[in-house]
Amino acid sequence: MIKWKNNRKVFLTAIAFGTMLNPLNSSMISLALHQIQHEFGLSFTTVSWLISTFYLASAVTQPVSGRIGDHVMSRRTLFLFGLVLVAVSAICAPFAPTFAVLIVIRLLQAIGSSAIYPSGVGLIRDHVKERQASALAVLSIFASAMTALGPTLGGFLMTIGSWPAIFLVNLPFILISFFLGFSLFPKEKKKKLRIGDTVRKLDLPGMLLFTVCIVLLLSFLLSLSDGIQYVQGILCLVSAGAFIWWEHQVDEPFIQIRMFRQEKRLSLVYVQFIILNIFFYCLFFGLPSYFQDELGWRVEMTGLFMLCMSGVSIMVSPLTGKWVDRGDERHPVLASAVLMLAGASAMTFFFIPAPFWGKGLVLALLGLSYGIGNVALQAAMLKASPQQMIGTTSGLFQTCRYLGSILSSAVLGMLFGEEIAGSHFEQLGWTLIMISLVGISVSLYFSSMVRGKQTMKKAAGIK
């Protein structure tokens, strides 16, 4: 047996190189939109579907692929299959004859990369028995780095290989992840199911209703900046009602609705993660526009300055993992929420008149909050999830990220309209203060619930 096959770091590298593909491709595409728009002769609204369809497909596929990994296919097989799909999309994209074909390839990329995360988290849950929070911190570091550096990498690739390069750059990461995963991931017993049992386990009607509900919800949220679309909203509520009704009727539902009542900690983790992503995607999307439109900064300077936030977030992630491993997730989750309020307050009252270095300190404070919250909530999700549903629950966790990001777009659209001026920036600050206050309230409730459960375990003599 080769020594590196038993190496924890190599095992996590195999997973991290795969799970980072989704955030990398969601952020890197932004630099290629202009060139793709002109090459295919499109409007900006049309070409932006490359982003919207990726979000929609990812939001739906994450929990669906998690369900498949929980009940039908081994996590190892699902992880490797996802890598193959992303590889196929990377190879085919440069040869797309029409924009419609490119959209299909982009959907394939989203589906493949979305299958990787829940299966990767499941592999950690099943095979990494010590310091799981630190293991999740590795995934968070890679994901945060790719989200932050994706636009920079995309801009560099555009200068050397035009827009096809942003697809082809996936191949080295895929090859490394596939080789290590194929060699390292333990082979699991095949889940031998009859076709009827497979259909029942998957709950295909439930998956379909969930897909319709999520697509309508995200479409409704994306359209809020142009006014409330009542028909879409009503259809979303109807499909949500039908989905909840159906899930209560079947013996093995796609998503156990009762779980959200029984596992209140998990429900609160999802709520906090949505809040965290609304808050920070408002900054990710809003700050670059403010720096360029109001302050007149160049794109390169804006990108480098945003590293004050994303860089601190990346650096604090491994420390947060160790913090959670040595104690519990309560204190990091609450600390993240308090830092959100501190950062939002500093941005509202001091950011505009602050000198260059002062603005950097405010972004660093905000990055501290995001890095701590990201890792702590992933660890909290893992601890609160039923063992047999870890794939589905981790997939839903990522769906919450997409809900938060799209809700942030709606918030920015309603606040700013066409441009971000100084007065608008203050409105954003007050909005973020209110969001962070909600986050603190939920975090306090979550902390009291975790503390109460720990007290009950101690009273019962359970470690």
List where the protein language model places each region.
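Hydrophobic transmembrane-helix bundles of small-molecule transporters
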Residues: 161-272
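A membrane-interface helix-boundary motif in multi-pass transporters
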Residues: 159-171, 222-229, 414-436
